[in-house]
Amino acid sequence: MCNLTISRYRIKFKANQNIQLPEYAGSSLRGAFGHALKNIACLTAGLNKGHCKCQPVESCLYRRIFDPAKQKLILQDRLQDVAPPFVIEAHSLSTKVLAGQEAYFYMTLVGDFAHNQQMMIQMAWQRALAVGIGSYHNTGQAQSQLVSFELCDRPQLNWQTSENLRVQFLSHARIQHHGE
């Protein structure tokens, strides 16, 4: 029997100033989270103008969480992208969050490694929300503050080991190809 650890967290924040988000805020949140995580978890980014130069890349906590290294496919002579062990759901966010308002979004962590780094992930969100999300966030003051990082769902997935596995994803993702 295999176990896959999946947990969904509700991240609530309070705006200290007006926040303008794009219509699809997921990529803005992902970018803010990635920058904050790199600043606190990558040992080489601060010395290389924000670029991760860790070698091997698997040794970098930032890369393992946010930008996993490609892996060689078994029985094939090519590399395959590896999805990061998280999903950000921003469908609940409005495009405007006014100063003093609270808002929330969700983050789902997948796998034991991501769960073992939950404290680092929470710290990265705290920093990302303070530095700013969305447009116009370079004011020098904390744009918003983390109110809570709460577990809201932890499904129990158990299955027998098999050669065939079918996974169906339901996503709020907005997929574009060449800008369309």
Short names for language-model regions:
Residues 1-180:
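RNA-interacting cores
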